[in-house]
Amino acid sequence: MVSHPIWAEIDLSAIKNNIKEIRRITNPKSQVMAVVKANAYGHGSVEVSKICLENGADRLAVARSTEALELRDAGITCPILVFGYVTEEEILKMVENDITLTVYSLEIANSIQKIAEKLGKHSKIHIKVDTGMSRLGFLPEKSSVETIKKIRELENIEVEGIYTHFADADNSDKTYTTMQFSKFTSFLHDLEENGIDIPIKHASNSAAIIDHPETHLNMVRPGIILYGLYPSELVHKERINLQPAMSLKVLVTHVKDVPENTKISYGCTFETKKQSKIASLPIGYADGFTRMLRNGNVLIHGLRVPVVGRICMDQCMIDVTSIENVNVGDVVTVFGKDGTEKISIEEFGNKLGTINYELVCMVSARVPRIYLH
């Protein structure tokens, strides 16, 4: 029995399949760091983390300190890497909870050292190298080698890992990724020439895991592929069998017959051309169903029907004139499968000119996640 008028179904067996597929195509000597930032790309970080760790992931990664603490509070004890910037106040909590931090300046390292020393603890860090993303990271040059030397000398810091991030690995042209990886491996060589051998080396994001096995090193960082979605249409999708984990569903809340020339929703931008049957749905842009999808479709009784009129904050309307026996309480699939028909995240993305990553992250926190085991 459905207890919510709107919900996101998260198929944990799909995530289990995906992590096993990632493990299958990854160098068996490489660790798998499951990326569960942004509430596991909207899927629910705690549940997803647990299923990943039970099925082949060795550790986790998040973007922010609050995300790491949520996992610790849920009883997850494995290593967790924070990719992003943390304030001095946050560093204290990270060190206390044995959470690994990303370092891309001597100043950050000194802050961690000061706090770790005060707490009488050792803090593990990973060095970030900017090989072409032009975001966070040391540039792969001689001065950076000297800085990393200084960081390694800090008594309460353990330099456990070093990594870079690819900017264009999901493209069919592999030139830029090859260049980035070459810069990274050359920098690793320069470090080793200076007596700095950092144990964990990682570069592969989802696209590189699929298309660039030479970049797997001794750890990979799957993100979007954990959730059954491909990084782009340009990667070699045939190499890995992914199953989408999220479906978004709602219940019909009202059905009415309206005459020809009835205006629907804000702005009166839609007008019926004949007598029509209109159903209301309890989903709107506050749930992640953006107003830009007003010309989209949903599924009911295994068939497509159009969204009509502007999408409201909490509701929208659909035209079910072509469907028999539509009743309050019927299930409507916003994306996912209904019988033999489906609406994919990618279809939404094409309508909006955006990517699948953004769309699953858009499903707001007020939408309950229902986990299917």
Swiss-Prot record:
Modified residues (N6-(pyridoxal phosphate)lysine): 37
Keyword annotations: Isomerase, Pyridoxal phosphate
Chain positions recorded as substrate binding sites: 135, 313
Domain of life, per lineage: Archaea
Phenotype seen when the gene is deleted: No growth on D-alanine, however able to grow on L-alanine. Slower than wild-type growth on a mix of alanine isomers.
UniProt-listed PROSITE patterns: ALANINE_RACEMASE
Record-linked InterPro entries: Ala_racemase, Ala_racemase/Decarboxylase_C, Ala_racemase_C, Ala_racemase_N, Ala_racemase_pyridoxalP-BS, PLP-binding_barrel
Cellular component GO terms held in the UniProt record: cytosol
Gene Ontology molecular-function annotations: alanine racemase activity; pyridoxal phosphate binding
Catalytic activity entry: L-alanine = D-alanine
Cofactor section: pyridoxal 5'-phosphate
Family indicated by similarity: Belongs to the alanine racemase family.
Function field: Catalyzes the interconversion of L-alanine and D-alanine. This organism is able to use both L- and D-alanine as a nitrogen source. May also prevent D-alanine from interfering with the use of L-alanine.
Protein name: Alanine racemase
Species, as recorded: Methanococcus maripaludis (strain DSM 14266 / JCM 13030 / NBRC 101832 / S2 / LL)
